[in-house]
């Protein structure tokens, strides 16, 4: 479990407030690796407006598999890398327990990997 603790000012957990997912149909590169996903959000969470023609009762289903926050990594073809947390809440969990937590460790490891060859 990553980020299952209080965050600074945005409620609980590293996934919330605004979320995003990996989706090949929407431009996620084929080489992207989904490291983890947060699911089970309340019905207050909906698809991005560009994915909906209209909002109706059917569009408010809570069990929609596309309403999730994906933690994604991919290497770019030019030698770089992308680490996407899939949620604006991620940053608010970095300082929890004096930075001794899963969010800080994973962020540190991702940044260290990106800087390794530079």
Predicted regions and their residues:
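Extracellular ligand-binding/catalytic regions of CAZymes and related secreted enzymes
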Residues: 1-118
């Amino acid at each position: 479990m990553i980020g299952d603790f209080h965050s600074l000012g945005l409620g609980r957990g590293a996934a919330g407030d605004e979320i995003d997912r990996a989706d090949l149909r929407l431009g996620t590169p084929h080489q992207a690796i989904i490291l983890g996903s947060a699911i089970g959000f309340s019905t207050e969470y909906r698809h991005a407006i560009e994915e909906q023609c209209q909002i109706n009762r059917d569009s408010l289903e809570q069990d929609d598999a596309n309403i999730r926050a994906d933690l994604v990594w991919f290497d770019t073809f030019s030698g770089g890398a992308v680490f996407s947390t899939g949620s604006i809440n991620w940053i608010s969990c970095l300082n929890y327990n004096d930075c001794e937590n899963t969010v800080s460790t994973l962020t540190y490891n991702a940044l260290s990997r990106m800087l390794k060859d530079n």
